[in-house]
A protein has these predicted regions:
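Structural signature of tandem-repeat unit edges
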Residues: 1-72, 78-131, 135-154, 158-174, ...
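Solvent-exposed segments in extracellular or luminal domains encompassing
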Residues: 567-568
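Short, amphipathic alpha-helical interaction segments positioned at domain boundaries
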Residues: 575, 581-590
Length: 594
């Protein structure tokens, strides 16, 4: 025992040792031989008993008493192998045969202790079974009746007799519970449970992170068994004939492990077929699911009409080509995938509708070319494709719906064809320059409205006329401009005064002035009036390069420069202080010459 630990005696002949003076974290224990009851307490609130890594054993203890201030207990079954009674005065634990905690309305089995064959057993009725809960347990009967489902941690049965049960079809299972995979299995079959208890569900309980060891192939006779799993082998054969229906009900995320590289089907399947490891409906018209671990190019065969929702979500393919027969791509079909190149074919006319997000979060996309056969780009189709740099939209596209290209931070410039009649709200909100053939309704709501960009103004080009717009308009002016339906209706003026806030007004005016777009007296006078405020803002934001450029414009008075010098020194900004001194010296030289 570490002599630096603090001892506490909760009951006769029991000594708990804490590593803190407040007695909140118990890390060691001693119990005299013959003691059959141990009390967990520390005399303070919020006590944690952390003894799992303490290699001591107290076989005489039959009862554990948990006082009201104990909130956490981590112990090994081997420390108290013969405990058969838990008495709890804490709201975080139950009294009973086993150690069961209650956390956020979830009951967690932590310890059954080392139960021997033939002992009286109580059925497990909890939500979750913790790692090592059955460690050292020799009995395997009576715990599970098959009437409940559980959330098993990966090592729930480690060190128990459950793992010594005989395997069948590569799995070790009993009473509707899969405990482990056979060490030597390369193929496993998870069949459909058909006993009296499970006939309505056909589903096992099993650890979510079931260790597949050397398994290369899994045969699933009931798809719902996959809902409990997060780990799969590289090949999955599905014999569940209801799979087609379940996929169409958006169950496809249950087979979304990137380790899956191929799907297989029964040769006589009535529901689906396999082409190049990808799952299709039996008639080949509906692409249901691509294995997430599939790589390289995918050429979807002619005859396919629909790509299902999330069919390629998170996939590792690099490119795809669509057949001319394709008429529908459902929501999130390619979302979060590693796709780099898309061949749209000549058949499809719409990339989704109102809930699209077909290619959202595809961060390997650099360039996209939208062909003339596509009329509609649906909501969020390319939302948050962070590395998308260029988009070529051909004549023929008519509608670009809400957020279609929103949060594409590297898409700095887009030119729309004259066929475009409508662009939805926020569709180009992250784009710096937008070129259109004519003004039309919705233009301002689509293009402006975000502060979260790394440039100062928006550039709207209508025909050959460039307008420099604030990032965000005041609502009234945005509404009025948004109603312009042709180029002649769009006001021929500067818009810095229409910005939503003072900072954006200043940024827009400054951009116009320093780039010689508008260096009129009106803009210059406005910037002079605002010069001190602008300078202090840039100083506070540590935007030294911008501040230097602003000082070079000569808009700050000598008095303002002196005040700015004091502020820069207070902030220990030596480079700005030095530059201001140089500018003040120019003032002195100019005065002397006069």
């Amino acid at each position: 025992m570490n002599n630096n630990l603090i001892s506490f005696n909760p009951c006769q002949d029991v000594f708990l040792y804490f590593d803190d003076s407040s007695l909140k974290n118990c890390v060691d224990i001693d119990i005299k031989e013959g003691v059959d009851t141990v009390v967990f307490d520390g005399g303070n609130s919020q006590i944690s008993i952390n003894l799992r890594n303490v290699n001591k054993q107290f076989p005489d203890v039959k009862t554990i008493v948990i006082n009201e201030d104990v909130i956490e207990i981590n112990i090994s079954n081997f420390m108290f192998p013969n405990v058969r009674n838990v008495v709890s005065h804490s709201q975080y634990f139950y009294s009973g045969r086993y150690l069961i905690s209650s956390v956020y309305f979830s009951d967690i089995l932590k310890n059954v202790f080392c139960i021997k064959p033939g002992e009286n057993i109580e059925e497990i009725t909890v939500d979750t079974i913790e790692d090592y809960a059955f460690e050292g347990c020799i009995e395997t009967d009576g715990f599970f009746s098959g009437t409940m489902s559980y959330d098993f941690k990966e090592k729930a049965f480690a060190g128990s007799a459950f793992l010594n049960l005989p395997s069948r079809n590569g799995i070790i299972a009993k009473n509707g519970v899969i405990f482990a995979v056979d060490d030597d299995a390369t193929e496993i079959i998870i069949d459909e449970l058909k006993d009296a208890v499970h006939k309505w569900t056909g589903v096992y309980s099993m650890p979510m992170d079931l260790d597949l060891k050397h398994v290369k192939k899994m045969i699933l006779h009931h798809l719902d068994n996959a809902e409990s799993m997060t780990v799969f082998p590289e090949t999955v054969m599905i014999t569940d004939e209801s799979y087609d229906t379940k996929i169409r009900r958006n169950y496809c995320n249950i087979l979304n492990d990137k380790r899956i590289k191929n799907f297989e089907a029964k040769p006589d399947s009535q529901s689906f077929t396999i082409i190049d490891g990808i799952l299709y409906s039996k008639d080949g018209k509906y692409l249901l699911k691509c294995p997430r671990g599939k790589t390289g190019h995918v050429s979807i065969p002619e005859g396919v009409k629909t790509i299902g929702a999330e069919a390629f979500r998170g996939c590792m393919i690099s490119s795809v080509s669509f057949p001319d027969s394709l008429t529908e791509i459902q929501s999130n079909a390619f979302s979060c995938s590693l796709i780099q190149k898309i061949g749209f074919g000549h058949g499809i006319t719409s990339l989704g509708y109102y809930e699209s997000h077909i290619f959202s979060h595809c961060n390997d996309l650099i360039h996209v070319e939208i062909p003339s056969n596509i009329e509609t780009i649906g909501n969020g189709t390319f939302f948050s494709c962070k590395n998308l740099e260029s988009v070529k939209i051909h004549e023929g596209v008519k509608w670009i719906r809400d957020s279609a290209f929103a949060e594409c931070d590297n898409l700095r410039s887009v030119e729309l064809p004259s066929s475009v009649e409508y662009i939805g709200e926020n569709s180009f909100i992250s784009t710096e320059t937008l070129k259109v053939d004519s003004a039309f309704g919705g233009l301002l709501y689509a293009f402006t409205g975000s502060y979260a960009v790394n440039f100062d103004v928006k550039k709207l080009i209508i025909k050959d006329k460039t307008y420099y717009l604030p990032l965000v308009f005041n609502p009234k002016q945005q509404y009025l401009l948004n109603r312009c339906n042709k180029a002649s209706e769009f006001p021929d003026r500067q818009f810095y005064k229409d910005a939503a806030c003072t900072e954006l007004k200043q940024n827009t005016a400054l951009y116009l002035y320093e780039n010689h777009i508008d260096d009129s007296d009106e803009v210059k006078k406005y910037l002079k009036r605002s010069s001190k405020q602008i300078a202090y803002r840039l100083l506070d934001l540590n935007k030294d390069d911008k501040l230097v450029k602003f000082i070079q414009l000569g808009l700050l008075s000598k008095a303002s420069l002196n005040e700015l010098l004091l502020s820069s020194r207070e902030k220990n900004n030596a480079s700005i202080s030095s530059y201001i001194l140089e500018e003040l010296d120019k003032f002195s030289q100019s005065t002397f010459r006069l």
